[in-house]
Structures are given as C-alpha cells and as structure tokens.
Amino acid sequence: MCGIFGYCNFLIEKTRGEIIDTLIEGLQALEYKEYDSSGISIQGDELKSLNIYKQTGKISSLKEEIDLYNLNKNLPFISHCGIAHTRRATHGGLRRANCHPHNSDPSNEFVVVHNGVITNFANLKALLVAKGYVFKSDTDTECIPKLYKHIYDTSIELGYNLDFHVLTNLVLKELEGSYGLLCTSSHFPDEVVAARKGSPLVIGVKGKTDMDVNFVEVEYLDQEEDYLKLNTQTKSSGNVLAAAPVKYNTCLRKSPPLRSQYLRNSTTSTFNHGSSTETPAENGLPRPMEFYLSSDCASLARYVSKVVYLEDNDTAHIYDGELHIHCSKIGSEDFSFRTVQKLELELSKIKKGPYDNFMQKEIYEQCETTKNVMRGRVDAFTNRVVLGGLENWLTELRRAKRIIMIASKSSFHSCLAARPIFEELMEVPVNVELALDFVDRNCCIFRNDVCIFVSRSGETTDTINALNYCIKKEAVTIGVVNCSGSSISRFTHCGVHTNTGPEKGIATTKSYTSQYIALVMIALWMSEDLVSKIERRKEIIQALTIVPSQIKEVLELEPLIIELCDKKLKQHDTFLLLGRGYQFASALEGASKMKEISYVHSESILTDELGHRVLAVTSDNPPIIAFATKDAFSPKIASCIDQIIERKGNPIIICNKGHKIWEQDKQKGNVVTLEVPQTVDCLQGILNVIPLQLISYWLAIKKDIGVDLPRDSAMSAPDI
C-alpha cells in the first residue's frame, strides 16, 4: 500500500481533462513513497457511471493507458468526485488486476482505494464467494467494494434506501485491521466517503471565495441503537446484513437529490465558524467548493491552505459541497470537532529547484534544517535550551525513573546516537527499542517511565502501536516528529517538532540529523536542574550553535567523494562500516543508506568486534569505512585500523581535520581519509554521517539508480 489521493468539485466547472490532471498531479506528489502501480477512477459519460483506469509501472504508464481510450477530455463537470492510488505490492503480486482502484462488479457500482491491511479478508472473501461474487485479484482490498455492494443490495431488498455514510458504517463494522480508504459509487453520484483507522487521511478544503472556518463538528453514531444492526446469528449462517427496525428517518436517503437542485434544505452549516452564523451563500445558492483528500498533507500544498485531519474511527462524507464527519466511537466533549488547520507547507520546499533529485537537495538542506530545529530553542548567550512543547509536563519528565526511546529504521538509529548523552546527563536507565519488537514483547512499562517516540512522518504504524500500548500503561509520552498534524504529534502528551520541512526522497537524510539534534536538546532540557552537569551542558550548547556551518564544510568533500566512488568503490558490492561509542549509530545509519540507495551489501560492526571472524573476510578486500574521529575511544579505534592496514585492507577513514596519525599510510596509498570538522563527542555523529550520505548517493548515481525511488524500499509498509 502507498498513496491515496482524491478530488471533489462542487459548482466549480472542471473539464474531464482538468480532473484527470489533478488526480495525476496528486499521485505524482506521492511518488516519493515507493510504488509499482497506479490507478484512478472518474465519472463516465453518463451520470451514474464510473470508469477505472490503472496500470503497473510508473505514473507515466498510467497516463499512456488513459490516452488509449481517447476520452473526451473537454467534457465539463459542474460537480464530480474522483479517486486515485499508487500501490506497492503487498497482498497480491505485481499485476494489473491487483492495482487499485478495486470495484464491486463489472459495472463499477462501488469503487475503493485503500491503504492498510484487512486482517479478516480471507473470511470475508469466502463469505462473498459463497454469495456468488467473483474476485479478480489477490488483494485484501477487493473484499471492501464487494462488501459494499452486498450490503447495499440486501438493504434495498429489505426496503431500506441508505445514506452513503450509513452504508459505509455497516461495511466498516465488518472489517478488521487497519485502513485509510476512499469510496465512490454510481448509486451516489458526486459523493465520496473517506474512512480512517490506523492509516492517515487528510482533507484539504477550498472555497471559491475565502472562508472563515475553524472546525468541523463530529456527528457521533449511536452505539446502542444504530440505524441498522447486524445480527450475529444470521451473519454466521451466511447473511451479512440482517435488518432491524430503523429508528431514525434521518438515516434514509433524501429524495430528490439536492445535487440536482443546487439548493440546500438544511438549516445548519456543515462547517462551523468562529461565530454562530453561517457564511452567507452566494446569490442564494450553496457555496462552490473543492475538496482534496490524501494520505499525506504534502501532496495538498499546491492546492489548499486549510486541512482537516481525520482521527481513527472517523468517516468523512462529502456531498453537495458539504463535509460531514461521523465517528463510530463516542468521544469526550473535547473531541466533538475536528479542527481546520492551516497547512504550513511552502510549495517551493516540495520542488527540486536547481538539484538533480530530491535526495541531493535534502542532503544540502541540512545546513538550514539543523538551524530550523534549534531556532528559538537554543540560546548560546544564556546557555539554555527552551522547549515550549514540553513545558507543561516539566515536573513529570524530570521525575522520570527510566527513559525509553521507541522508533523504526533511521529514526531508531538517531535514538541510538542520542542514548549515551541521555544516560550521561540524566543519570537514569535509557532503553532504545525497535517499535515492532517492543510491541511483540509486551514490554514492562510503568507510570514513572518517559517514552519518546521518534518518526519523521508521525504515522509509522509500528511506532503508533507502541505509543498506544504505552498510553494504556499511563507512561508520559513525548513525540519527536516532522509533521505537526500527524498521529504521533496528536496522541502524545507533549513533543518537539523538528521543523525539517518535506522530505520527498525515500532515503532519510535531513530528518536524521534534525531528529538527532532534537533528542540532544531534550536531554539538555530535562537535565537543566542537575548542577553537576552545568559545564557539560554549556559545552554542548556552544557546539550546537556552530553545527550548521560545520555541515557546510563537510559538504565541501563532495568532489573527493565523487572521485572516490568512481575510482575505488563503484565496482564493489560489499562494504564494512566500523564504529564505536557515538559512532556505532553512524555506522548503522551509513550501512542502511548504502543498502537502500546503492543496492550493495553493507554491514555495520562495532570496532572491537573486528577480530571475531570479521578479519577473515578482509582478505577479499571489501571496502572498509571506519569512523575514527577524536573521542574517548580513539586509541582503540586506531589500533583496529592498524590491523586492517596490516592485512592490506586499505580502509577509508572518516577522521577530524588535522588528524595526522595515518599520514604516512595515506602517502603510501594504504588509506583514504575524509576529514570532517571536530565538535563535541555527542554531536560528532551529525557531521560523520554526511560523508556516508554522499557516498551512498554517488554510488547510486554511478550505477544509474533512481535515488528518489529505489526498488523495494518504502516509507509506508504499510505506513512507515
């Protein structure tokens, strides 16, 4: 699963070509999430008809597929809803039948795009096959539109003409697992429903004129007396839907459709404003509206400035220019609405600009992003760190008996890099956990634990599951994320926003260094009351202020790295990376980048573990990259490097400027050194990892690998 996008226009005329272009552009904005197929669904030539176009390969292949149909792209639509999807094969292999959107039947009565995993799809599929439904794909998603059709047909037979969101609620009750989905139907023209549970969805809102909109009320569904009830006895005997008396006439479909009249009979506005009055309609008619739906707010930046984030168990229903949000779980009064938020994304930040690709752009942006994460937070004159997002939990955080950092992939490496400074400054046990393993083990969590959750997207599925687990255990939770409206930022008690900006390349580059600094700042802030650590804190704070300029110096190594990749590295397919102390995390992150981007086998090794059978492979002369910057472990690391040189290993050494210990070996051609500026030990990893980012990048370029979309790599698996 990967990217979802949808577009709805109401009383704003768009041609079919414009609608297709909008959907395609939305998918292209999601290309940074690796995918292997794509598809769209739009209205056909008739009012109650839907067409599906999908193809394996890149989005360009989808565009070619659409062009084969010779569609009338000048056909105007005053109102229309279209949905689109990019897919990374999970359930079901890479073939056209498995691409999204999926339909309920050959006439496309219901069409669905979906992110997530339906865990009971096998049971649903067996039930629907027994009812005569024919499945064309191997996916779990296909059971959703067919379930829509079955429940809809059954309700019609029983005399019930359901509203779209009521029908959706009945379908969702049958689904187990996670989902972020959009559904359109020929029975509900110009309408779309969006549902979220464990997979993100955001809705962009745009009026033809400016709107003063602050929030959208949530309409909670009654759990005791629902519109229709599923009878467990008849369900087990093969009947999916058993009708109970309808209590509320409001659940029934309005007739005639408001859409055909362009009038509204409701006395209340769907949107709620700062005052109790509605925004006046234009010329007595409903307000012309556009809605953009996506699994990632970054794809909405070019279209809207106001967005609504759906919460778990929310169902959004868009029709007649209105947005209604329903929730299947009763919430507190504090959560009886969804805030309309300003989208804080600049379009220029999601374009490549003068760079060849996004990865190169994001490597070079680290001079600026490291400033951004510290801006207004690090005061070099008073030697203080101020984190306003944590202030309300100051007492609880400083009473922590244990700190647990939980993350996945590169975010996990940033936690490992920051762990030693937490232990040193806080003087409490500090654990670093892989989110998936943490949940699998049902770890012991106590109320006096502080759990820090790190994720660049804020939507990492495993990390969110770990967060929910810790909340149930009543631990204090901190979020370190880049996306302010993400699930982790909303569900944690407090947090730090890294202010990194969009990162569209698959490889984590600028997010890693920003997370690293954010974690160091948290350690400095939490230890402020420890008098014994004052001088150490001053040293780190002063060093933080010059990190951005030092990164600029490191980037000047690029010409040397290009030459190194061209002459020495590109012919190899195995690499060893050595590090110790703070630099073991750098070795892990560097090895991860080389696997992910350069398609080479790379292994990170603790330096002193070199003698445990690892030296046996150095005779085959794989490139060995060693981190040997000055710190407490420098003498031991130097000894290990000497052993490598004795065995003709020819290592590449990342060391500090002016470090002359290997000068003679360098002159003999036994070693290559990449010299980086020296900083305090706990921050050295920020500078040391950048040469590895550049090596990974240029190795990939030399091999003609698309660095922004490497194979078999995804930020979402289903949602990382």
UniProtKB/Swiss-Prot annotation:
Keyword Coiled coil: no
CDD domains with a match to the protein in the record: GFAT, SIS_GlmS_GlmD_1, SIS_GlmS_GlmD_2
Keyword annotations from UniProtKB, A to Z: Aminotransferase, Glutamine amidotransferase, Repeat, Transferase
Catalytic-site annotation from UniProt: C2 (nucleophile)
Major enzyme class: transferase
Classification via PROSITE patterns: GATASE_TYPE_2 (PS51278), SIS (PS51464)
Listed GO MF terms: carbohydrate derivative binding; glutamine-fructose-6-phosphate transaminase (isomerizing) activity
Biased composition (Polar residues): 266-280
Glutamine amidotransferase type-2 domain mapped to chain residues: 2-321
Known catalytic reactions: D-fructose 6-phosphate + L-glutamine = D-glucosamine 6-phosphate + L-glutamate
Swiss-Prot/TrEMBL GO biological process terms: fructose 6-phosphate metabolic process; protein N-linked glycosylation; UDP-N-acetylglucosamine biosynthetic process
Protein name: Putative glutamine--fructose-6-phosphate aminotransferase [isomerizing]
